[in-house]
Amino acid sequence: MCKEKIQYIEFEDFVNNTGVKESTIKRRYKKIPGVIKTKKGFRVISGTRYPYNIGNTKLENSASKRFTLLKAISKYQYISHKELRLEPQQFVDMLRDLLSAGLIQRNNLCNTYGANAYDCTQLGDEFINRTDKAAKNELINTIATAVGTFTVTVLSQVFDSAA
């Protein structure tokens, strides 16, 4: 969550931001991390997103899971390790890979459930606009390049300090 006090947005603003009917959000509020029902109505933590519809998505391998994660972040929708059928640490590692490849960035909002703490960069949005197959292949290469560059940098620093 936020380092300072938790910030809230108006329920009406959340409804407007999501593009989903108010009645649907009220009915499904328990499935939306960050929406809290009170006696006076609903409170929404800043940065809350409506869940990504993963129904027709094929999660065949890690590339398709990474692409789905990037797509959900790009659409400002909630997704977590559960929807991607991953262990929590694998999910964190995928987020770290996308972050190091420059495809996503932290958004500094209060809701950090799942991938809510991240937004797509311009490069990430460009991947989403390509065909799925081409984007998945290039996504793998981009992440591998970013991770490889990081690994080589760390190794060279280790060897330099040992010498």
Regions found by a protein language model. Give the residues of each.
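Beta-hairpin "wing" of winged helix-turn-helix
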Residues: 36-39, 105-109
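Polyanion-binding surface elements
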Residues: 1-22
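Minor-groove-contacting beta-hairpin "wing" of winged helix-turn-helix DNA-binding domains
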Residues: 41-47, 111-120
